[in-house]
Design a protein with these regions (language model features):
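Active-site beta-strand/loop signature of hydrolases that rely on acidic residues for catalysis
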Residues: 1-13, 41, 79, 91-95, ...
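Structured beta-strand-rich core segments of catalytic domains in phosphoester-bond hydrolases
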Residues: 2-89, 193-196
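Solvent-exposed, acidic/flexible segments
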Residues: 3-7, 34, 72, 102-109, ...
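Active-site-proximal beta-strand/loop segments in catalytic clefts of secreted hydrolases
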Residues: 3-5, 25-29, 43-44, 55, ...
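Loop/turn elements at helix/coil->beta-strand transitions in domains of secreted/extracellular proteins
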Residues: 17-22, 86-91, 121-126, 149-151
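Metal-dependent phosphoester/phosphodiester hydrolase catalytic core
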Residues: 47, 71-73, 80-106, 110, ...
Length: 198
């Protein structure tokens, strides 16, 4: 799952990763052609797309809109994929919570859980990644609670994991752990933060 790529970056990824296919949605829904997107990519020889969709994190989720006290329009994209070998299906949701609005983060997280329950149901295998703009051990940890109540954290539950920060402003900011992966009805085998520093 990708948050914030713009069209030149998306075109680069598509060119460099021809074995993958993708589903994307710009958060402005075409209002700003050069704006930021949310995107999911998957191996086309391994998975088949069964369904896909998107919703905005706002009181009007079917249209590009600002949520509560959010600074930006925020959207969640999702796909339902079928493993071609095992024929098992799963859902993948990818989101980006607001970076300023506290109410927008709280209600955005609550809406994500509500929509996952509505779209996938309570018994499906679900993976959910995103820039949550929320960190454990700080006041923003409260915005992760809706996920904790219904899902498990891959970083905390994986057999093999790490504690590397997911954000450091390209070396210009204090390291922070703002990005998270949650899952349901699956097993976390490995969690790794790929920061290009190795």
């Amino acid at each position: 799952g990708f948050q914030e790529p713009e069209l030149p970056q998306i075109e680069y990824l598509i060119k460099c990763l021809p074995e993958y296919v993708h589903f994307k949605q710009d958060r402005e829904d075409g209002l700003r052609p050069n704006g930021q997107y949310l995107m999911i990519m998957w191996l086309k020889n391994k998975y088949e797309l069964c369904d896909s969709g998107r919703f905005w994190l706002s009181p009007t989720p079917d249209e590009a809109s600002f949520g509560w006290d959010g600074r930006c329009r925020r959207v969640t994209v999702w796909v339902k994929l079928r493993d071609k070998k095992s024929e098992r299906t799963f859902y993948y949701f990818n989101t980006h919570l607001d970076h300023r609005g506290n109410e927008a983060r709280q209600k955005g997280a609550e809406m994500n859980v509500k929509m996952m329950q509505r779209i996938a149901g309570k018994h499906a295998v679900i993976f959910h990644s995103g820039d949550m703009n929320s960190q454990r051990g700080t006041t923003t940890e409260a915005y992760l609670q809706p996920y904790d109540n219904w899902m498990k954290s891959a970083r905390e539950r994986a057999v093999e994991s790490d504690q590397r920060a997911t954000f450091d402003g390209f070396g210009k900011s204090q390291p922070r752990w703002l990005d998270h992966i949650f899952y349901r009805h699956a097993k976390a085998v490995k969690y790794a933060t790929l920061d290009g520093k190795d």
